[in-house]
Amino acid sequence: MRHPFFTPLLLSFFFFISLSLALVPSNQTIKFVNQGDFGEFSVEYEATYRPLPISNSPFQLMFYNTTPNAYTLAIRMAIRRSESTIRWVWEANRGRPVRENATLSLGTDGNLVLAQSDGTLIWQSNTANKGVVRLKMLPNGNMVLLDSNGKFVWQSFDSPTDSLLVGQSLRLGGVTKLVSRASAKLNVNGPYSFVMEPNAMSLYYKSPNSPKPMRYFAGFSNWFTVEKGTLTRVTLRAEVDPRQGFATELTLNYEVAGTENGGPILSRPKYNSTLTFLRLGIDGNLRLFTYNDKVDWSPSEITFTLFDREFNTGNTESECQWPERCGQFGLCEENQCVACPTEKGLLGWSKTCMAKKVSSCDPKSFHYYKVEGVDHFLTKYNKGEGLRQKDCEKKCNLDCKCLGYFYQTKGSLCWVANELKTLIKVDNSTHLGFIKTPNM
């Protein structure tokens, strides 16, 4: 009598054996050492770089660094002849740089490994003994490990950092957010994130003063809002309009319950724009960078900016809603930084504008000055707490990291701010800001 589990066990055994026999052929194994001369062309962040022979124009795998002896393995988009700035669209090891003579290797077991020269493991694809036979760069910038049937075992599209190429997604069960770079020199996670939430896409700022990230944008209603179900995927798409030659609609499509829906049209360049990526910048702004491979000179351009007066497409936001618009502190009106709010009134704004630092948590050591007709970047996309004004102030008093509070007398709504940055001028004089300042 045949055991009821015999057939499934036998099939599993043969499947395991077939995977173990599917080795990377010797002519497809690689080992690249991070050494030698640097490239000569302009790159983002004023980096130095070493190209690797894994490419599909205009994409190429490289080592690059912005600080001595601290390299990132990355994919760039641009080609040398175009005199266009090389931009980084994917990174393997943000925050864990490798040094000179580090190695990138794909052995016969099919695991792609980035290691220091002493063998210390820095990053890997986790694909050992999973049937990988080849590494390949696809025309869309997706670097993939393939099995003998040409199916993806691993793909770079599954691990975005601060950028999404056309066809790349944020997805439930995988990476659900983009995170900004800290600075041009420092390649670690920065304070900004673009997050796929259950029913919308939101931008957050994480301040050292705040216990949790502060939301400063949540997609407009004409982006998309999910009333039933949950967002499972958001994908950057480029749809060529056959009625308009090569004009391309660049959209953020969204998926709910397995069905993809058309999202907001962010931009509509009048040429084939499939070589586009969405970037969450160091400054917390969202931009589309588009590369026109039919142009020899300066083929790369910005085709969308979220916080920008120039891209008035209906899917953009006022620059005044952008936390970084007026630096550490300032009042913004009609996209311009117009004043520095002080206890003596509104003074001329400059980049040196800054609220006075309160060094003590004792309420007797500080007071507040009032600024009328203002909102904070928190107020538009975060629900205020229903409190009396004196209770709102008390809440700020009890928080040593609170720098001020914002209050709307109509509705008795309170927002406590652990970061000031850009204040927004509004016509309603019942919208008030109270800035904490030391007693002299």
Regions found by a protein language model. Name each.
Residues 2-440:
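Beta-rich ligand-binding surfaces for carbohydrates and other polyanions
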